[in-house]
Every structure is written in structure tokens, then in C-alpha cells.
């Protein structure tokens, strides 16, 4: 998709909108639902911190898939412990194979 915008700063702002929307949803969860439900995350950093960092680092598409996998691992029979966002995207990850962005099992595998 090519944007017909002459202003380079405007182009950056428009391309950053999905990332900001994802991080905004996490902020809304942290300040509305999370205080009511309480702290129950089995990992460090918390799942919302993980999601915020993943979306900031990799964008809404890849970071969203990483966050989904982390949320599915954060359950009573799932993983626990220190589980940081990877520094780089996995080598086999492509936009049309989104499940390859995430670790579905294990911690920091």
C-alpha cells in the first residue's frame, strides 16, 4: 500500500497508528480492568508489559501474535517465570505465517 503523502512526518504518524492503537488498548486494560481483577500473571514481566513491549518493538501484527501466544501460555498448566520479549523476530516469521512470530510453548525457547 502506497500512501500519497508529501510530509515525511505525517507519513510516520499514519504508519504508527496501528501500533499506537494496540498499545492504547493495553493501557486501557491496565487502568480499567486490571485493578478490578487483580494481579495474577505467572510471568515476569507481566503479560500486559510483555504485550506493550512486543507491540512497540515489532508492530501490531507481529507483536500482537507474540502477545496472544504469551496470554495462552499464562494459565494454571502453562509456563511461568522470566519470559522476556525476543530481541529479534524469529528467522522463519513472515507476515503471511503469523503463528511463527510467537513461542507457543516454553519460556525463552
UniProtKB/Swiss-Prot annotation:
Cellular compartment(s): Cell inner membrane
Highest taxon listed in the record's lineage: Bacteria
Topology relative to the membrane: Peripheral membrane protein
Any one Gene Ontology cellular component term annotated for this protein: plasma membrane
Main location: membrane
Keywords from the named record: Cell inner membrane, Cell membrane, Membrane
A Pfam match: YidD
Family annotation (PANTHER family): MEMBRANE PROTEIN INSERTION EFFICIENCY FACTOR-RELATED
Record-stated family: Belongs to the UPF0161 family.
Role this protein plays: Could be involved in insertion of integral membrane proteins into the membrane.
Annotated protein name in UniProt: Putative membrane protein insertion efficiency factor
Amino acid at each position: 500500500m502506497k500512501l500519497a503523502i508529501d510530509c515525511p512526518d505525517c507519513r510516520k504518524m499514519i504508519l504508527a497508528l496501528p501500533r499506537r492503537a494496540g498499545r492504547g488498548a493495553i493501557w486501557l486494560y491496565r487502568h480499567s480492568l486490571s485493578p478490578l481483577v487483580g494481579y495474577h500473571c505467572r510471568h515476569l514481566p507481566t503479560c500486559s508489559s510483555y504485550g506493550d513491549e512486543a507491540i512497540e518493538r515489532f508492530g501490531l501484527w507481529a507483536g500482537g501474535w507474540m502477545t496472544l501466544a504469551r496470554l495462552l501460555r499464562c494459565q494454571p498448566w502453562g509456563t511461568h517465570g522470566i519470559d522476556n520479549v525476543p530481541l529479534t523476530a524469529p528467522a522463519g516469521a513472515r507476515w503471511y505465517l503469523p503463528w511463527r512470530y510467537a513461542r507457543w510453548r516454553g519460556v525463552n525457547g
